[in-house]
Amino acid sequence: MSNSHLGTLCFIISLLGLANFSLSQTGLDDSTMQSLKSSLNLTSDVDWSNPNPCKWQSVQCDGSNRVTKIQLKQKGIRGTLPTNLQSLSELVILELFLNRISGPIPDLSGLSRLQTLNLHDNLFTSVPKNLFSGMSSLQEMYLENNPFDPWVIPDTVKEATSLQNLTLSNCSIIGKIPDFFGSQSLPSLTNLKLSQNGLEGELPMSFAGTSIQSLFLNGQKLNGSISVLGNMTSLVEVSLQGNQFSGPIPDLSGLVSLRVFNVRENQLTGVVPQSLVSLSSLTTVNLTNNYLQGPTPLFGKSVGVDIVNNMNSFCTNVAGEACDPRVDTLVSVAESFGYPVKLAESWKGNNPCVNWVGITCSGGNITVVNMRKQDLSGTISPSLAKLTSLETINLADNKLSGHIPDELTTLSKLRLLDVSNNDFYGIPPKFRDTVTLVTEGNANMGKNGPNKTSDAPGASPGSKPSGGSDGSETSKKSSNVKIIVPVVGGVVGALCLVGLGVCLYAKKRKRPARVQSPSSNMVIHPHHSGDNDDIKLTVAASSLNSGGGSDSYSHSGSAASDIHVVEAGNLVISIQVLRNVTNNFSEENILGRGGFGTVYKGELHDGTKIAVKRMESSVVSDKGLTEFKSEITVLTKMRHRHLVALLGYCLDGNERLLVYEYMPQGTLSQHLFHWKEEGRKPLDWTRRLAIALDVARGVEYLHTLAHQSFIHRDLKPSNILLGDDMRAKVSDFGLVRLAPDGKYSIETRVAGTFGYLAPEYAVTGRVTTKVDIFSLGVILMELITGRKALDETQPEDSVHLVTWFRRVAASKDENAFKNAIDPNISLDDDTVASIEKVWELAGHCCAREPYQRPDMAHIVNVLSSLTVQWKPTETDPDDVYGIDYDMPLPQVLKKWQAFEGLSQTADDSGSSSSAYGSKDNTQTSIPTRPSGFADSFTSVDGR
């Protein structure tokens, strides 16, 4: 045979082979599609008469005649689905919703290209156990409103790693919400709607740190705390109506995009946190039918509010009206017990002397608090000492723990304190001889502490109810850490081995949700997915916990490890990664120097900028290492929009490094004192006032709204950082000391900056929260005058700003007052009136005696009354309901109901840098600390 004939024969054989392959592929889908056609009772308006399924109505195929889309929606179709649908291996979209199809949903496992499965509003009776198996491309699944037999969400959901929207409302689901909805298993999940099922148990802590924007869990048997919501910073709408959730509403200040908050018909207790009330994004809130306490919250005019009178335990029905001081005190007492429902049910109204369980009064004064055998847990609140007429306190036969507060010894009329048969520990305080103290039945009384891992489930006694609570769960975690850490220290050798094992395991474990860096063994890890200015931190691939993370600490000394461990949800980053991003800590990258190290600018391979604070062996003494660990401990507990957030850290041999977000607008000091040199514009009064309020809110959280009281001790303009939006954030917590439980002062070495130091602190070294008030007063003076706290360029009698300010104020000379105002501030009548109020406030803050200074809450109230609050002016075009929330609430509800087909509330179908100050060495700061950070993630804000 000639070569030409042979070539022709080969060509013909190839064509026949290709034709046979094409026919076999088409035949595969054709058989399945014919089975589908036979199983369904198609209506007359559906034309599936053509022999080629690719030409059927609502069916699409690819270039190889493989079926990719079947979209038969709202056609009134009856029948069942065939069992061989899974052979449509190229299927991308299957939509059969709003029909009358019945029978079981067939096995669809292995459909690796399927992106959308929409079968809602049919008559399906069961779900295959391996429904999600092999569906690695699945992005959307809607099965709501089907009469399924009871079923449990299968573990195979974890295989749908691309899942974004999952709607399974009214689907007969039972059991608990699984943990795998966390960001590690389903990193792209943004909408989770599981309402009207039979779910029970608590919200999984794995929700923390997820990208979930819409969470609907209405009408079930769910219970426990909702504290995890405070760490779901991407939330836009959350609806938990009609469950059995209890405890307080957590701090929600980190949920900057939250629009809809519906917790109607639960058993929530405690004070509505100011962080919810002040959310500028909020449009709809529903709190009716709970046991919420304290004052009725006053939301902005743009917020649609559903708070039916007498359907909670508020002290009055008038929004914004303050409670009787006795009520505030007792609510604070209830907070330390974890806000038990039994107290919230009884403690209603604004007069605790009328039918409040356990409360007895005489002449309007509370004389007896009797909580015997009330099944209380938690601790004794020091706030009890505010009830100065108390004669009897009976807390016997409960499950209380902790110490007996020293403050109770100040009760001059107290005759009996009975804490028998609880779990108190420590040495009881010394009461007067006239007081009978009954402590029997407390096995650990007189000892350092109980042999337990938890102190109290309730909020710590040092916190106050006015700013809201983060719930009992968070306090329990905090307590656990205090006990666990010493244990970890005792077995450090074993933990080193475990840490090494974790590192090796982390290197082997694959994370399909991570995006591999092309340049190194790194991944891009989103720090705050709900933020407009996402900060991405490049770290080595690892097995990171979502949200809560591990609270224990271990460290591998291996230089080869890229990441050591996760502590309290923060990233432990290798020294090599930090060397790479800072150009090996080059001089060109230095942003500033401080007493304990140098701060470098770093840039990740994707362009993200960070600030790295490095303390080398030459400057890290034992004391410095203690400072470093203290700084980590404090920073990891700070969650507030106006406080710094720690991104990560590194411990490697003698290296100690902290990683902060980069703040493009630098420090307040730069804008206030060096704006000309840096080519900036001077701050106008409105901006200065907003910055002052931001700082006050951040420090207020430190003082009274955190689980324990913190004192900053070195407030100054170089420790106040500004973001691109010019919102302020307080930095430099290296000098913070944790105040003792229930107290607000400590005695320690003087650490701060001259000019900002309160006189009693500078002289005696005794520090209280009032030293921060003094420092803030100095900052207010600087904002008004544009002068530094200490200015050597001024005449000798005017070098010290506070002294000069007092002299001007005492003169009561109107011209002297106006001449003292920064000439760069444009003045009109309103501005002058505003400055006068801040001038007066600054003077009170810098009073010589600490007791004459206001607390930070008062400062916030004064400043907030002078600040124009932002109001929403545009409707989000991407609103999931397509509803204009600027319409009147009745119209919104009507449109919402029409969309949902429900008669109730909506358901669910269908700076220069962080961590650095001046480049100059600042000897007056003892020591200088970082001064730049960006927006914090999962805040625990009270304001």
UniProtKB/Swiss-Prot annotation:
Positions of glycan attachment: 41, 165, 170, 223, 231, 286, 365, 451
Extracellular compartment spans: 25-482
Localization annotation: Membrane
Entry's Gene Ontology cellular component terms: plant-type cell wall; plasma membrane; plasmodesma
Biased composition (Low complexity): 454-467, 906-918
A Pfam cross-reference name: LRR_8
Designated name of the protein: Receptor-like kinase TMK3
Gene field: TMK3
